[in-house]
Every structure is written in C-alpha cells, then in structure tokens.
Amino acid sequence: MKSTFSTVLITGSSKGLGYALVKVGLAQGYNVIACSRAPDTITIEHSKLLKLKLDVTDVKSVETAFKDAKRRFGNVDIVINNAGYGLVGEFESYNIEEMHRQMNVNFWGVAYITKEALNLMRESGKGGRILQISSVAGYYPSPCLSMYNASKFAVEGLSQTIMRELDPNWNIAITIVQPGGMQTEWASSNMQWAKPHPAYENDRSWRPFWENYHGCEETDPNKAAELLYSIAKLDRPPQKLVLGHDSLELIRKQHQDIGEELESNVALSTSVAKDDFDPASVETLRQNLQSM
C-alpha cells in the first residue's frame, strides 16, 4: 500500500525544515504541494511542484489548499504539519493577542489541516500518512516558552487521541515528531519575543539562553527530511519519533521524573477510592488499555 503514496503536502515550506522537505520530496519523485504564507519566496521550480498560499489559521484557506492539491494531483497521500513558530517570554509577559496567535498557528492550524487530511485519506481508500512536527517542548516544558509548550502539548494530545479513533483498515497513520534544536531560522528570524516583564528580570531568567541559542542547534534539517520520508514509507510508522540527542535526553529525564513522582504518590492517589471499590476492576482496566 505504501508504494502507491506519491503526493505530499507540506505546510511552512518556505524555509527551514519545510524547505528541506520540499527539496527532498522532489528529489525522491514525489508530487509536492508546498504551502506557505509567502509561496513566492520558494525559489524552487519543478514540474511536480505546486506552490500554494496558505494561512493555516483560516479554515477556508485550508479547504481551498486541499481542493487545489486534489485538482492538480488527484489526491494527497502524505501531509506534514510543519508550520509554526516560537513565542519567547515568561507567561506573565505575554499579552492576550500573542497568546491567541501562538495557539492559532501552532495548534489550531495543525487541527484544521489534520481534519481535512483525514477526510481526504479515508475517502480515497488508499489511506495516508500524517507527520506532526511537534517538538521536545511537547513533552519537556522549557522555561520562557509556556505558550509554545502548551501548543505542542495540545498537538500531541490531539494526535494521540486521533490515533486511537482510526480504523486500522483505513491505512492512515500519524507520527508525532519531536525535534530538539534544528539548524533553521526557528531561533532567529522565526522567533517572536514578548515584552520583558520587570518582575522576571533576574538571574533566573531564561531569556539570555534563548537569545544565544541560534547556532547551537544539533539537528541537520536535510538529514531530518530524509528520515521523515523514510518513516512515511513504512507500513507501520512509529507513533512518536524523537530527533536529536538533546531531545532524547530531555524526554528521558521528563519521563523518569514523571515516573518517580507517580510512584512516590501511589498511596495518595489511591486513598480517594470509594469504600466498596473492587480492586479487581483495575486488572480489567489494564486489559482494556492493552487492547486499545
């Protein structure tokens, strides 16, 4: 089934990882729909390339993009939700507009694209692959990125729920990708800064870390793009894929910390059970979870 996947739609494709995904996709023979707010900045020209202007926060724009893609290539087999940006600042430093904008692009944009993709892939009878470019910040919360973290946590919760709703016979798979630092414009021109809050201007502030982060990133976007296409070709792609040593170590630490705190509070967690609670029901729950 996977060998019939021939068309990929990529959001946020004018630079960084998105641009690398366009180049690699064309090199591997895919029909590529490169979506961007500024498609004219995509300098690549190719007979298999369709450049589309897309605002992921606008439902009508998303619907139009999929219609145009289907009209040109007949279907969309792989969708890579890559559009997004980072908003830096302590939570109290954000204004309401900044907070809404971060969620609209990083979460609602992904939700709109995913909903449209699922409908098209299910009705095509071929299935498809959806790759959600999340972040290490979707599992490990980094200071001064609270709204960015929240947007990525939301993407992961949404995606994991959808995975459990899909009929395996539809051949639709979702992979959550959790990169660490990547050699792109994310930490430079693509990063937005909230106005500093005076209460947080002290030695504990993480602003200096983010101000100096660009240039320290580990992951090569071209290598990442190659890997993601390899993942999309698998019959059973992973549900989560961590990219980079930095992301791997931070996620391991968070996983360990969560597990340790969970076990240390077992007595508290179970102390609220009703008086006639049947412990055997826990085993039933475990069995049900294993079958999901």
From Swiss-Prot:
Annotated catalytic residues: S134 (proton donor), Y148 (proton acceptor), K152 (lowers pka of active site tyr)
E.C. numbers: 1.-.-.-
Source organism, top-level taxon: Eukaryota
GO MF term set: oxidoreductase activity
Residues bound to NADP(+): L17, D55, N82, K115, Y148, K152, T184
Subcellular location: Cytoplasm
Membership in a protein family: Belongs to the short-chain dehydrogenases/reductases (SDR) family.
Protein known as: Uncharacterized oxidoreductase C162.03
Organism: Schizosaccharomyces pombe (strain 972 / ATCC 24843)
